[in-house]
């Protein structure tokens, strides 16, 4: 398997997750709101909406862009399944194209 990334999770991260798991708010709640506000400030953005997955983020992107059954979206099959699924969830049709073997770009 080709390694493409690695997480850095320390004891502070684990403690924060355990704290949320023990709380009443497994989803939503004050920690999510704080994270969105902190991220918004960090990015210098007026708005921020975090999602539970990359699939959800890609789907929301398609909906925000107004993709529908009349749209075709170019993508590569050398990606996570979420990429093409989000296109389909938005009503558009994925068009698969080759990528450059050296850069992995379309």
Place the predicted regions along the sequence by residue.
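Conserved PLP-binding active-site segment in aminotransferase class I/II-type PLP enzymes
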Residues: 1-64, 68-69, 89-90
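PLP-dependent aminotransferase-like
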Residues: 63-106
């Amino acid at each position: 398997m080709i390694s493409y990334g690695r997480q850095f999770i320390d004891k502070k991260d684990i403690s924060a997750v355990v704290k949320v798991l023990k709380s009443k708010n497994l989803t939503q709640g004050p920690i999510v709101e704080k994270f969105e506000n902190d991220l918004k400030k960090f990015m210098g953005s007026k708005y921020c909406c975090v999602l539970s997955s990359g699939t959800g983020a890609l789907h929301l992107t398609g909906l925000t862009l107004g993709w529908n059954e009349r749209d075709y979206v170019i993508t590569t099959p050398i990606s996570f399944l979420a990429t093409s699924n989000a296109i389909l969830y938005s009503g558009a049709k994925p068009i698969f194209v080759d990528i450059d073997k050296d850069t992995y770009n379309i």
